[in-house]
Amino acid sequence: CYGVALGDITGEKPDLLAGVRRSLGTAGIPVFALPGNHDKYKVDDATPRDASYFRYTMGPVDYSFNRGDVHVVCMDDVIYTSGTEYTNGFTDAQLAWLRADLSFVPKQKMVILCYHIPLRSGTARNMAAVKALLSEYAEAHLMAAHTHYNENFINTDADGGLYEHIHGAPCG
């Protein structure tokens, strides 16, 4: 048993991350975490927010692990263009990392990709390439948060028929 916090865990106050880390440590199970758009440090309105403080406090933002027959990939999909504006998706460097990571995973394994902003909108950067990679596996699931409601979304067959589980964020 384990948990994954899919972001928006500090409500615009990244200085709370140390306390969040301590709290997650009391869960009695391993809990992994990703940053949401409300967890990145804001310098000012012009400078794009980044996850450096999240990495310092919580650990890497792009990583993977195996639990039984499941390969879990966690990635930061929040791309800030200023201190207030952001989009979602994966950079070319992240896509290369994902491709390399999955090259070691047998095709019969289940893969779960965890990130913050749902990919169902169709505008996420490198979304088609990510879905194509995941479609090569016997079973793949997408796990997101960001919204303030729960939704299950099945991508079209053209998108690999991937199942996106969208969980309401705890804050934001």
At which residue positions do the language-model features occur?
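N-terminal active-site segment of His-dependent metallophosphoesterases
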Residues: 1-18
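Residue-level marker for buried hydrophobic side chains located in beta-strands
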Residues: 3-5, 33-34, 113, 142-143
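Active-site glycine-centered loops adjacent to acidic/histidine catalytic or metal-binding residues
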Residues: 7-8, 36-37, 116, 145-146
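Conserved short-loop catalytic and cofactor-binding motifs
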Residues: 8, 83-86, 118
